[in-house]
C-alpha cells in the first residue's frame, strides 16, 4: 500500500536519499559512474533545505518509510501552451512499477489544477529507460534540447499534456 502526501521538512533527508539513489540506478548506463558515485546525500539535503516544499509530494509505505517523491510548480522555461511543470519524480528502483509513480503524478496534477494551472510539461533525458512511464499517459512531444553532464552530451525531450484535467481523469481511473 502506498500513501502520497505533501512533503514536510522532516522528509528532506529521505527525499535526498531517494534522489541520489534513483539517479545512480536510473542513469548508470547514461551518465559516467564516477559522476554518479560523487553524488552525496548531504549536498542534496542542503539543496532541498534551500527550496520551498510547496508542490513536493512523497510516497511512503505502510510503515511510513519514504521511497519516492515528485515536485511540481510553474513552468521554468518558455513552452507555448504550457503553464505547469513536473520538475522531478523519482522512486527507489525496488518500488517502481507498483503504482506509486502514477499516484504521485495524479497528486501533482491535482495540485497544479488547484493552483490555476491547466497544462503540464516535463523534460526527460531521451535515453532514460523510465521515459515509458510518461509515454503511458500519452503526452505530446513538444520540445528537444541538448545538454552536457560529466562530459557526456545528452538529449532531452519535452513532453506535455495540454489538458491537465484530462490527464487527471486518466490517472484516477
From Swiss-Prot:
The keyword Cell membrane does not apply. CDD domains: NAT_SF. It comes from the Bacteria. Its EC number is 2.3.1.-. The keyword Transferase applies. InterPro entries: Acyl_CoA_acyltransferase, GNAT_dom. Residues 2-171 form the N-acetyltransferase domain. One of its GO terms (molecular function) is acyltransferase activity, transferring groups other than amino-acyl groups. Keywords: Acyltransferase, Transferase. Belongs to the acetyltransferase family. This is Uncharacterized N-acetyltransferase YuaI.
